[in-house]
Regions:
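Active-site SXXK
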Residues: 4, 36-60, 105-111, 152, ...
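Active-site helix/loop module of the DD-peptidase/beta-lactamase fold
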Residues: 35-40, 52-88, 112-144, 164, ...
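Short, contiguous, well-ordered secondary-structure segments
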Residues: 84-95, 104-110
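Generic detector of well-ordered secondary structure
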Residues: 51, 76, 108, 128, ...
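Aromatic- and histidine-enriched alpha-helix N-cap/loop-to-helix transition segments
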Residues: 35-44, 66-69, 97-104, 146-150
Length: 270
């Protein structure tokens, strides 16, 4: 049995996934089906914002968010703002406070600088060029994307081999920002430290963790509370989408799935 087929055992009405490798893309399920991907949104939105940085519409270290915060702080959950409000929960740079409100704030700044709604900017700058024609932002820039496995494969391919965004920009996105910060990964508790890039959560030494325990420290990605995730590690990437909200069912199954897939990758590469 292919390791990817483990996804078919998840207790959800609909599941689909893809494994990207140097030799090609393996898929399972209806890869054209649209899903509410929740916080996997942050990966796509962060790349859209970084395109605005490349274009000079905004600067990564310009003031943004609460006093003393920058766009960099907002994108790496270091601004101190709460999850769902712009109220400061902690001082800037004090702790990794996971925040969708911070992404909404960052997207608003880009929208003002670009002179157009952020969803339009994202569509014109990133989604259309990548051919992500089933992907659209409906509401929050922190968790409002609708997408499909097919489209997220295109996004993951851009992360593996950037054609639209500059490789240096992508490298910065996958570099740990404010590396000593501790923080909580939703559903997985406090981690000291809790590494995060710009958009991308970095695996580091986190345990327990949705990516599993055998992934490389620089593996990067995100999961969504709707039962979705995307990770990139080395020359490989995985997309998994389900229509059952994240919960206790997901913790063992996601970890087992990812550990089995990564073990298979390592065995094949040896």
């Amino acid at each position: 049995m292919s390791a990817l087929e483990k996804i078919a055992q998840w207790p959800a009405d609909n599941v689909a996934g893809a494994l990207l490798a140097p030799t090609g893309v393996e898929t399972i399920g209806d890869t054209a089906r649209e899903y509410d991907i929740k916080s996997v949104t942050k990966l796509v939105v962060a790349m859209g914002i970084m395109l605005a940085v490349e274009e000079g519409a905004v600067e990564l270290d310009q003031p943004a968010g609460p006093e003393g915060s920058t766009l960099r702080h907002l994108l790496s959950h270091a601004s101190g703002v709460d999850f769902d409000s712009r109220q400061a929960k902690r001082p800037v740079g004090d702790r990794r406070i996971y925040s969708s409100a911070g992404y909404e704030w960052a997207a608003e700044i880009v929208s003002e600088a670009a002179g157009m709604p952020f969803e339009e900017y994202l569509d014109e700058g990133l989604l259309k060029p990548l051919g992500m024609n089933s992907t659209r932002l409906e509401g929050s820039a922190g968790h409002g994307l609708i997408s499909s496995v097919n489209d997220l494969v295109k996004f993951a391919s851009e992360v593996l081999d950037p054609q639209i965004i500059h490789p240096d920009t992508l490298a910065e996105m996958r570099t740990i920002q404010f590396p000593d910060l501790r923080g909580i990964v939703p559903g997985y508790g406090m981690h000291r430290p809790c590494p995060w890039g710009l958009g991308f959560e970095i695996h580091g030494e986190k345990n327990p963790h949705w990516m599993g325990t055998n992934m490389p420290a620089d593996a990067a990605g995100h999961f969504g509370m709707s039962g979705t995730y995307l990770w990139v590690a080395g020359d490989y990437a995985m997309v998994a989408l389900a229509d059952r909200d994240f919960g206790e069912w997901a913790k063992p199954l996601w970890q087992e799935t990812n550990e089995e897939i990564w073990a298979g990758i390592q065995a094949a590469d040896d």
